[in-house]
């Protein structure tokens, strides 16, 4: 067994690897950038080495610095985790050449599967079915358009290198093809250093089903069954499960055999995933799946496989790289129950899933209800430099319905403040009828996006509790305070307090008065309610109109977030003396919705633009975001340049004021 492992990663995967190493008695070394100096993975590791500035390109993607850190710490192996350098064959070979063990496949195996076109050709030779498409090297836009027309729309443009949904675009028509190709190429170049793309037929009722494989250096390869990753948004996985619902046993066997065959074709050793796309238009069938790509690393969603097989995949990685054979044969592996994983992100689903940046002021995760893999804690800063994942919530049960119910229950108990999260979106998705009935597909989220992301109005009891919290009324009274037990009293008038709250730009007026110990009368937007907020552990039990509600109120300096039934509402106090702060002409400004890089500018001073026309493209947290003109008009000012880093709310462009309408 290894003596000391350096984890060349950050966040939840670094923490997860560290925990298995500690269980096995293997010493650990973390690496960190400036932004991660106080990160959880740094605190958990036995020691930590600083590797550079905050941008990943200068730290977590610097192979030379990581190898040097391993030597300085006396590590005998490097675990790359996922992302960053995990599928970089040059890094794997450099680590090996330096005398370190790379906890993953060989550089040759990574290289063989890293370019999707070459990988598909290799799979065809190994008799593994592949999706119809163009996988050649000609990148001329006219030629690629002709290939797309030959294949037939809709098509999928995919980056030749890399994965994770980067450089991927679904295109419905020939008219939209060129812009989509250019965008995919820019994104691919930024993410992988290779702008080339391939074209594939888009399956109209697709299921994303992948097989976990594992090989060793003794020629053994097994599969650990399938995962269904069909719930996706913009090709990014959202909720994964294992096994796949509706999977016939003959198809499970056929897919497993195909995955093993794929791994054997490249002499694979270590953990890997063979991703297939399956046509579910007439149910899952053994002849209705095709190879998409192989991920030559541990997957984000590996915990669901661990849950149904009882296998610690990181432990297997450590044993295999130490020269041991696989701990189990294929006939010793079986499926036990069902498991789900939901990816909890700092992002605002109601605002188009914009990444949320800032301090994570408060964080409660339901560790008594689910397995929680997290790399952050309260007080951490969610930065623009890395993926904004907060945690993975994993549940297991004897059957699908039980495991899914446990997931929904666990998600309802997530409470985070300081930054927006997608917890409510995930819970709604877990309860979506088609998904609950076992009918997932990659288009499900898009079809139901409106109801999954709509803003729910705050119930009166939520608003009233927010007002009481911000007024200080819920703070415990001093011991033996005689006034605490008396109804409010003011000379000549009823004792009432008034506050105005702001929720996403909407103001709501609340008045309330004490009606005895622990009782209040409140008026919310003209509706009278009686409120009896009593504490039950860390929750408030409120009674309104004869019904009891369980709520949580987490207060900041001048704001409060109230949680109820898996939904949350953030309120801030409105200063009654403050006037309207909206500046005239604000609608003529195109501003940055988050910190990031100005990737592309399509506007010049004096240019006429149309409403909805893309004027700039920003990149942040590995996403491209198009900013469009709010109205027809003419560009008055361009305040930034391509390649410039900007802060949230920075003004990028200004339109000329609209001409005044002559009513004469």
Please report, for each region that a protein language model flagged, where it lies by residue.
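N-terminal beta-alpha lobe that positions the nucleotide/phosphoryl donor
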Residues: 1-274, 278-302
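Structured functional modules or segments
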Residues: 580-664
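Short acidic-glycine loop/turn motifs at beta-strand connectors
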Residues: 173, 215-220, 278-285, 322, ...
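Catalytic P-loop NTP-binding/switch module of NTPases
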Residues: 548, 554, 558-593
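Conserved nucleotide-binding/hydrolysis modules and their immediate coupling elements
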Residues: 312, 514-539, 544-550, 558
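Catalytic cores of soluble metabolic enzymes centered on carboxylation/carboxyl-transfer
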Residues: 259, 303-528, 614, 644-664
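Short, well-ordered beta-strand elements within core beta-sheets of diverse protein domains
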Residues: 168-170, 201, 247, 389-398, ...
């Amino acid at each position: 067994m290894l003596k000391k492992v350096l984890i060349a990663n950050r966040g939840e995967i670094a923490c997860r690897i560290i925990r298995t190493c500690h269980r096995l008695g293997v010493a650990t070394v973390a690496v960190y950038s400036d932004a991660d100096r106080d990160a959880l993975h740094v605190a958990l590791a036995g020691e930590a080495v600083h590797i550079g500035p905050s941008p990943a390109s200068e730290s977590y993607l610097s192979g030379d610095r990581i190898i040097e850190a391993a030597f300085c710490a006396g590590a005998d192996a490097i675990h790359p985790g996922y992302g960053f350098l995990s599928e970089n064959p040059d890094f794997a070979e450099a680590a090996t050449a330096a005398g370190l063990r790379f906890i993953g496949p060989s550089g040759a195996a990574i290289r063989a599967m890293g370019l999707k076109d070459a990988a598909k050709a290799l799979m065809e030779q190994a008799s593994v079915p592949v999706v119809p498409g163009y996988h050649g090297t000609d990148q001329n836009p006219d030629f690629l358009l002709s290939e797309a027309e030959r294949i037939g729309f809709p098509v999928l443009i995919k980056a030749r290198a890399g994965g994770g949904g980067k450089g991927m675009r679904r295109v419905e028509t020939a008219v939209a093809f060129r812009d989509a190709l250019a965008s995919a190429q820019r994104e691919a170049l930024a993410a992988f250093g290779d702008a080339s793309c391939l074209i594939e037929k888009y399956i109209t009722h697709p299921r994303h089903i992948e097989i976990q494989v594992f090989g060793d250096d003794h020629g053994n390869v097994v599969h650990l069954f399938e995962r269904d990753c069909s719930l996706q948004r913009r090709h990014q996985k959202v909720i994964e499960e294992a096994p796949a619902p509706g999977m016939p046993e003959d198809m499970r066997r056929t897919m497993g055999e195909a995955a093993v065959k794929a791994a054997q074709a490249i002499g694979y050793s270590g953990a890997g995933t063979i991703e297939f796309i399956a046509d579910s238009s007439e149910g899952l069938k053994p002849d209705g799946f095709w190879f998409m790509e192989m991920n030559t690393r541990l997957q984000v969603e590996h915990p669901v496989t661990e849950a149904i097989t009882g296998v610690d995949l990181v432990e297997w990685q450590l044993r295999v790289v130490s020269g041991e054979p696989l701990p189990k044969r294929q006939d010793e592996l079986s499926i036990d129950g069902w498991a789900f994983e939901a990816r909890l992100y700092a992002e605002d689903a109601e605002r188009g899933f914009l990444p949320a940046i800032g301090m994570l002021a408060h964080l409660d995760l339901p560790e008594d209800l689910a397995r929680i893999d997290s790399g952050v804690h309260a007080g951490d800063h969610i930065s623009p430099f890395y993926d904004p994942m907060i945690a993975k919530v994993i549940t297991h049960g004897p059957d699908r319905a039980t495991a899914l119910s446990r997931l929904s229950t666990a998600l309802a108990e997530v409470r985070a403040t300081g930054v927006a999260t997608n917890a409510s979106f995930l819970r709604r998705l877990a309860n979506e009828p088609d998904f609950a009935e076992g009918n997932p597909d990659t288009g499900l989220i898009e079809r139901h996006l409106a109801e999954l992301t709509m803003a729910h109005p705050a119930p009166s009891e939520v608003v009233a509790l927010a007002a009481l919290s911000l007024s200080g009324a819920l703070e415990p009274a001093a011991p033996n305070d005689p006034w605490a037990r008396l109804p409010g009293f003011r000379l000549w008038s009823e004792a009432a307090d008034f506050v105005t709250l702001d929720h996403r730009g909407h103001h709501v007026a609340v008045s309330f008065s004490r009606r005895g110990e622990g009782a209040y009368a409140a008026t919310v937007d003209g509706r009278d309610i009686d409120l009896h907020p009593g504490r039950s552990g860390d929750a408030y039990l409120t009674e309104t109109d004869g019904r009891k509600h369980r709520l949580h109120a987490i207060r900041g300096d001048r704001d409060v977030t109230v949680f109820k039934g898996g939904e949350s509402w953030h309120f801030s106090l409105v200063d009654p003396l403050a006037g309207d702060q909206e500046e005239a002409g604000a609608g003529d400004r195109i501003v940055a919705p988050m910190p990031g890089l100005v990737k592309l500018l399509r506007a010049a001073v004096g240019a006429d633009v149309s409403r909805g026309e893309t004027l700039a493209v920003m990149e942040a947290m590995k996403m491209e975001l198009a900013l469009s003109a709010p109205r027809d008009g003419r560009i008055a000012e361009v305040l930034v340049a391509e390649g410039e880093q900007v802060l949230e709310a920075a003004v990028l462009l200004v339109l000329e004021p609209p001409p005044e309408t002559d009513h004469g």
